């Protein structure tokens, strides 16, 4: 599999549709939004485009299922990861502030011993009636060569892809439509602590 870290920018559905139309398989994870009927419509749309979707609820982990679904297959695994919903997020430098992002892409690449790429999707040639979608992809990203012995590789790899994404996103920040709180200073520390405790309880 090709593991790809994405942020909530541009139209990843259009990008995914293009990939599927050109004969490549996609397996990805989608958050279970409310009401369930809305989530079902999102899944139907993406499956209709040729993608395989694994649903995940807040506080839930589908990492094991994802590993088994993609291991040994020739698939692209794009994962939206600039926001953590699992309660096991990694704190990174995003621009000039600390943010909490998902461990998924780095953890999957490490687990499968596969390279990690990062993509930034933006709009180009915008008109009142539409726009083109531009996908920029870099990688494989790597951990620093001077990574200390015993340091957490997943954390280092996560910081590496976030830094690449932030650099690309700086050209079109208006296309980053993150409508949730991701910066640590904006998060409720008590709620975050509860989410982490619940994640640990479920994954003992």
Question: What are these regions, as identified by a protein language model?
Answer:
Residues 1-58, 87-92:
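Catalytic core of membrane glycerolipid acyltransferases/transacylases, capturing the structured
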Residues 21-25, 48-49, 60-204:
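Non-catalytic C-terminal accessory region of glycerolipid acyltransferases
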């Amino acid at each position: 599999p090709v593991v790809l870290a994405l942020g909530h920018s541009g139209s990843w559905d259009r990008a995914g549709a293009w990939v599927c139309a050109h004969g490549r398989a996609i397996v990805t994870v989608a958050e279970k939004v409310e009401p369930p009927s809305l989530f079902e419509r999102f899944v139907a749309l993406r499956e209709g485009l040729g993608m395989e979707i694994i649903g995940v609820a807040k506080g839930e982990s589908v990492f094991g299922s994802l590993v088994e679904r993609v291991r040994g297959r020739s698939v692209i695994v794009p994962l939206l990861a600039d926001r953590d919903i699992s309660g096991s997020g990694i704190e990174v430098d995003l621009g000039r502030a600390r943010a909490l992002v998902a461990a998924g892409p780095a953890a999957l690449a490490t687990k499968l011993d596969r390279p990690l790429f990062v993509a930034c999707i933006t709009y180009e040639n915008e008109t009142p009636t539409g726009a083109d979608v531009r996908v920029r992809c870099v990688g494989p990203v790597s951990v620093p060569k001077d990574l200390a012995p015993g340091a957490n590789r997943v954390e280092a790899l996560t910081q590496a892809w976030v830094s690449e994404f932030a650099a690309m996103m700086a050209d079109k920040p208006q296309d980053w439509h993150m409508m949730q709180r991701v910066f640590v200073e904006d998060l409720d520390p008590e709620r975050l602590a509860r989410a982490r405790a619940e994640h640990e309880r479920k994954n003992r």
